[in-house]
Each structure stands twice: as structure tokens, then as C-alpha cells.
Amino acid sequence: LDVKDCFYGTENAPVIVGGRYGLGSKDTTPAQIIAVFKNLALPMPKNHFTVGIVDDVTFTSLPQEEEIALGGEGMFEAKFYGLGADGTVGANKNSVKIIGDNTDKHCQAYFSYDSKKSGGFTCSHLRFGDTPIRSTYLVNTPNFVACHVQAYLHMYDVTRGLRKNGSFLLNTIWEGEELAKNLPNKVKKYFAQNNITVYYINATQIAQEIGLGNRTNTCLLYTSDAA
């Protein structure tokens, strides 16, 4: 409003376009910024636009662009889908601290939870790089994805954004033909089209056998390191 007021009534005033972002606590990503610049390049840019949501009521949202990776070759990004109280978040926090304290790598971590805490959905977003990390948004184009709950394959789009030639780790009771049968077709198609390397382990059974209860983090983080 201050900018518009400064130019109000002046000759040769520039085109001033405004919009909203972060609605509903949505993340703001590079793809959304690209959409804003493409809107500004139009002969008649849309004013009072929104990014990050699909506005199917007043139709103010800009078209969603494909997510891009800005970290460069030295950046490694990972996402871990876990269950509240299974130790995934705690193990990832420790991993970031260990790598940050004992290597020359720059580290960044974001963690998201649902309201149920124990037994609820968790997602860890990790970045490691040779140069300072200035990405102030969640991981959207990971090199590595770990799904610690097999039911999430049918509940969430866990392969979304996983880069070509990336890696995927699954904690599951399925193996062999049973695994191939139970994987959703869209997941298998994504793996095939993007040359994804897939690892699977029954970390739940291993944790119970060695007395860790439902704390599968030790088994899975060790496997993630090997992957």
C-alpha cells in the first residue's frame, strides 16, 4: 500500500502488482517465485494473485511451476517420512549435529509433525552441502527418500520430487514378490521412469528382536547411511 500511495497520481507510474504467499501456512518455494516473475512478464499481469494454494473459488492463484533444485552439485537433500515416537526425528537431529560438528559440510534441517505427536505423521527435511545453505524452504527435490511406514505409500505422495537416479528406502514387512505386488502402480512407474534405486528392510521386526521396541531409528538410519 505504501508503494502504491507513492506513485498514485504521478505520470509514467510503473505497473504495480501485488499478491499473497504462505496462505494456510504453505511453504514458499522457488517454483512459486518463478510463477510470480512469469506473471509480471505478461502484457496484463494478474493483480492480487496468490501462490502456494489452488484457489478454485476466486481463481486468483498463479499456475504451479515444476519444482527445481537450486543447491548445485555439492548439495545433498533427503526426506524421511516417519511415525511419531519411532525415533526418526531424534536420529536425524543427531545426524545433523554429528555431521556439522565433525565434517566441513554445511547442514540444515527442518522437521514437521502433526498434532498427535506420538503415533502421528512426521517428516524430516535434511540438507548437506559444501557451501552455505540459503534455502529457507522445505526439501522438494530430494536425492534420497526414506519411508519408515509402509502404509504411507497409499496415504501420501512419498516419491514426489525424488530426483532422477535417486534412492528410496522402505521399512516394510513385504519382500520379494509380495513387495512387487503391494507397491502402488504409480510408485513402481515412478521408480522405473526415473531409474530409482530401491532398498527395503523389515526394521520393525529387527528392532523388536533386539529389544528396541518400536524404536526403528537405529536400524533405518544405519541402512540410510549404507544406501
Where are these regions (language model features)?
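Short glycine-rich anion-binding loops that position phosphate/pyrophosphate groups of nucleotides
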Residues: 150-152, 174-175
